[in-house]
């Protein structure tokens, strides 16, 4: 790590000196929903350390839409163009130049720029190109340095990782729990779609971006049957690309459940989960969103992802781990590298689920325990 002498110990370790006279702060984090939820405590720490500064998120188009007129630690969003290792273009998104973006961003005259987007091989050059007085963040072995940096080590809880990163600039942790409050507009949109609840609601989210994180649809259907039998109204949520797996859960459940595919915007989904007695989900953005809005959760994790992403709290949450360490198809050991193998890495091209060993009974027992209070 390279940084000035620390001011003193914080709740998670040393806290560096604050940067003087900071009016504008850039924060690079341009990936998906769950990834963003993980940095909310870091953003709250930055807000507490620099209460008068404007915090600008360098993010994706969905960030700009979500944070428009929404209270929280983000004042403004600058949309970063698609770039290798940063983000892929949205469907139909017009081409844009990273060089033009950086030129426009430099006109903001940032005092402080924070890299909270992975190890920095692709993101540190962008942060360095903003022209801020001070840059800080994470650095993997193949990444260029920033003014203040902390070594990026893959297996670390994401919330703690980014809290340690912002501590480099004097932003001590104020919480380790991501929190997000649905707005009145969010709640009204959710009510318009879902109507009033006649029974307590639970939500199941059977999708996940990576197929290796998906618990089988028939297992979710078994959970739906159990909870519907206990008297709960069961919602099955999904994005439009998850229509097939939602349909599989609904068809296999054998009891009335309510599919919600693409009917709820992100804010309305947050409000929906906030009003649920429980959310059961694969390791996914919606799982982390549910936890952030205060819903009790049962999360199904591959063990490597559990290290990085599962909440450490158990009062309202039950992460359940799959201990699979070898590809279920070819048997390749997936522990030497990072999660578990990227597509095409090494000798294993397979995308089969790594969480099929999680039993239905364990998920149902965890759900019932949380629902019992």
Regions found by a protein language model. Give the residues of each.
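Catalytic machinery of carbohydrate-active enzymes
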Residues: 1-373
